[in-house]
Amino acid sequence: MEEENATLLTEFVLTGFLYQPQWKIPLFLAFLVIYLITIMGNLGLIAVIWKDPHLHIPMYLLLGNLAFVDAWISSTVTPKMLNNFLAKSKMISLSECKIQFFSIAIGVTTECFLLATMAYDRYVAICKPLLYPAIMTNGLCIRLLILSYIAGILHALIHEGFLFRLTFCNSNIVHHIYCDTIPLSKISCTDSSINFLMVFIFSGSIQVFSIVTILISYTFVLFTVLEKKSDKGVRKAFSTCGAHLFSVCLYYGPLLLMYVGPASPQADGQNMVEPLFYTVIIPLLNPIIYSLRNKQVIVSFIKMLKRNVKVSY
């Protein structure tokens, strides 16, 4: 009888933000604009890198893939959020929930490894400039990209597997903006302590590994930059690395709070700021952060616009 009751709940309510009814339309329009800018910004960055052969080097291949993952994460979360602003029902089926979580888990994990790889790329470029073409080849870059996506899929499969063992019989209210393993584990009538443990072990390990890689890489970069006697070289190095460091700080802060800090059944799980930040705000900011501080991207973008204008006339 208990098992039958446990299988009854196959739909969930994503509460999302708690807001007054009069804020429904303004919030919908605000997030719609954010989403459109995010998609145009990231796809535009991908198009610029794709069209310009001069940008077919590791630094920009990594940047293009970061833009792809950001668009992926945003497109997994925002459309459902927009629908919930206008829909009378905020229901999502269990199968949709699992698919959404799986997609987000792949994107978030892949981005962690991409940011670490980008830090290593900058380390080699600045600390070993003469060896950079021999070390950081396009072939190595592509292999690192493939490994990042494979790691993202494997990590998502682990949590997805543990998610399948959960049953839901008491509550179907998910206090989150999307389906995630932590809020789902909190409402499960199955013992979910192993799910929280897996989040702490695997998500924590991935974040620690990527953060340590980034910190070590930029520590060497900092010492190398400080040894430079050329002011122009110092400015160029800080300009190149500053955007990446800023993006890293914005990305890992919410993730650490989300996946390492509250990994316990006692956490209330109702803070929407962290997931909103790394699924909506970061994908919006990344193309702006990287493009505005990168002269080559700006020049290539202007050239692409000029070519398109000539073709249209």
Swiss-Prot record:
Extracellular side: 1-28, 78-98, 165-195, 262-271
Zinc-finger found in the keyword field: no
A cellular-component GO term for this protein: plasma membrane
InterPro entries assigned: GPCR_Rhodpsn, GPCR_Rhodpsn_7TM, Olfact_rcpt
Gene: OR5H15
Keywords attached to this entry: Cell membrane, Disulfide bond, G-protein coupled receptor, Glycoprotein, Membrane, Olfaction, Receptor, Sensory transduction, Transducer, Transmembrane, Transmembrane helix
Annotated function: Odorant receptor.
Species whose genome carries this gene: Homo sapiens
PROSITE patterns according to UniProt: G_PROTEIN_RECEP_F1_1, G_PROTEIN_RECEP_F1_2
Residues on Cytoplasmic side: 50-56, 120-143, 217-240, 293-313
Pfam families on file: 7tm_4
Cysteines joined through disulfide linkages: 97-179
Signal peptide boundaries: none
Membrane topology: Multi-pass membrane protein
Protein's name in the database: Olfactory receptor 5H15
Annotated localization: Cell membrane
Glycosylation sites: 5
Gene Ontology molecular function: any one: olfactory receptor activity
Family to which the UniProt record says this protein belongs: Belongs to the G-protein coupled receptor 1 family.
Transmembrane segments: 29-49, 57-77, 99-119, 144-164, 196-216, 241-261, 272-292
Primary location group: membrane
Entries under Gene3D superfamilies matching the protein: Rhodopsin 7-helix transmembrane proteins
